[in-house]
Amino acid sequence: MFDFDATLPLMALQFLVLAVVLNAVFYKPLGKALDSRADYIRSNENQAREQLAKAQNLAQEYEKQLGDARRQSNEIIAAAQAQAKQIADEKIAQAQKEAQAQKEAAAKEIEQQKQEAMTALEQQVDALSRQILEKILGSELVK
């Protein structure tokens, strides 16, 4: 069935030589290429992770700065509104004081004019009363 002659060891030797040649010519360069490609992918993946971490840190920092800016702007707006309200309240108080002063001055003037009118009216009433009495009683009895 099988003949054991020199061809079998020769075929085994050829197989080993072919394996060594293929290993030297094909498998080692291919392995080196695959290893270098894996290293390249790993380094790119690490760089991508680092850049992603930096981007996330920057995003967090910008969000914090944005929050701080919003808080500061809200504080500035609140301060400006409070100041505007204070100024408006002062102006209103001043206007009310001026209105009250004008009202009091007008009331004094009205009271003064009323007193003058009453004095003039009393004088006229006295004069008219005297005239009426003179007409009724005569001018000699009224003096």
Curated annotation (Swiss-Prot):
Keyword set includes Methyltransferase: no
Native organism taxonomy: Bacteria, Bacillati, Cyanobacteriota, Cyanophyceae, Oscillatoriophycideae
UniProt entry tagged with the keyword Heme: no
The organism of origin for this protein: Gloeothece citriformis (strain PCC 7424)
Localization (cell): Cellular thylakoid membrane
Purpose of the protein: F(1)F(0) ATP synthase produces ATP from ADP in the presence of a proton or sodium gradient. F-type ATPases consist of two structural domains, F(1) containing the extramembraneous catalytic core and F(0) containing the membrane proton channel, linked together by a central stalk and a peripheral stalk. During catalysis, ATP synthesis in the catalytic domain of F(1) is coupled via a rotary mechanism of the central stalk subunits to proton translocation.
Assigned keywords, A-Z: ATP synthesis, CF(0), Hydrogen ion transport, Ion transport, Membrane, Thylakoid, Transmembrane, Transmembrane helix, Transport
Family (UniProt): Belongs to the ATPase B chain family.
One cellular component (GO) term of this entry: plasma membrane-derived thylakoid membrane
Domain of life according to the entry: Bacteria
GO MF annotations in UniProt: proton-transporting ATP synthase activity, rotational mechanism; proton-transporting ATPase activity, rotational mechanism
Signal peptide limits: none
One Pfam family from the record: ATP-synt_B
Main location (coarse class): membrane
Membrane association type: Single-pass membrane protein
SUPFAM superfamilies: F1F0 ATP synthase subunit B, membrane domain
TM spans (from-to): 6-26
Protein's name according to its UniProt entry: ATP synthase subunit b'
InterPro entries recorded: ATP_synth_b (IPR034679), ATP_synth_B-like_membr_sf (IPR028987), ATP_synth_b/b'su_bac/chlpt (IPR002146), ATP_synthase_B_chain (IPR050059)
Assembly behavior: F-type ATPases have 2 components, F(1) - the catalytic core - and F(0) - the membrane proton channel. F(1) has five subunits: alpha(3), beta(3), gamma(1), delta(1), epsilon(1). F(0) has four main subunits: a(1), b(1), b'(1) and c(10-14). The alpha and beta chains form an alternating ring which encloses part of the gamma chain. F(1) is attached to F(0) by a central stalk formed by the gamma and epsilon chains, while a peripheral stalk is formed by the delta, b and b' chains.
Disulfide feature: none
